[in-house]
Regions:
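Positively charged n-region of N-terminal signal peptides that target proteins for export
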Residues: 1-4
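Sec-dependent N-terminal signal peptides
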Residues: 6-13
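C-terminal motif of bacterial Sec signal peptides marking the signal peptidase cleavage site
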Residues: 15-18
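Residues within mature, well-folded domains
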Residues: 20-128
Length: 128
């Protein structure tokens, strides 16, 4: 009986420690980031320079930690079975009401590998 309680407690502890948690995003205002879906309000653009300086610290984190940190991505693109992209728009995208695009909006691209880990972080106005 004591062994089964000990095994259950250790299993629970292992399971809880394996869950992803949010990543430190430096001076980026995460509340503004999460409330600015598709970059419509322009709040994410205020943190673009800060993001550029810390973007490499997100390499290797899993997709769940990314979602817990920045919220649900504005767009997800599955390239093939081995990689996908998470898009977070810094400038208003075509999904914003009343926005007429003259150029592609600035966005953050997180490239996810087959293990759902971030393998590349890019700030660009180009599609992958």
């Amino acid at each position: 009986m004591k062994n089964s309680v000990l095994i259950l407690a250790l299993s629970l502890l292992t399971w809880l420690s394996s869950c992803s948690s949010a990543v430190d995003a430096g001076k980026i205002n995460i509340e503004n980031w999460k409330s600015d879906r598709y970059g419509c309000k322009g709040l994410r653009l205020q943190d673009a320079e800060e993001f550029r300086t810390i973007k490499n610290q997100f390499l290797g984190i899993d997709n769940q930690a990314l979602i817990k940190t920045f919220g649900r991505p504005d767009r997800v693109e599955l390239v093939d079975k081995s990689q996908s992209f998470f898009f977070y728009f810094l400038e208003p995208s075509s999904d914003c009401a009343g926005v007429e695009l003259k150029k592609e909006p600035l966005r953050v691209l997180f490239r996810m590998n087959a293990l759902s880990k971030v393998s590349e972080v890019t700030v660009t106005d180009q599609n992958p």
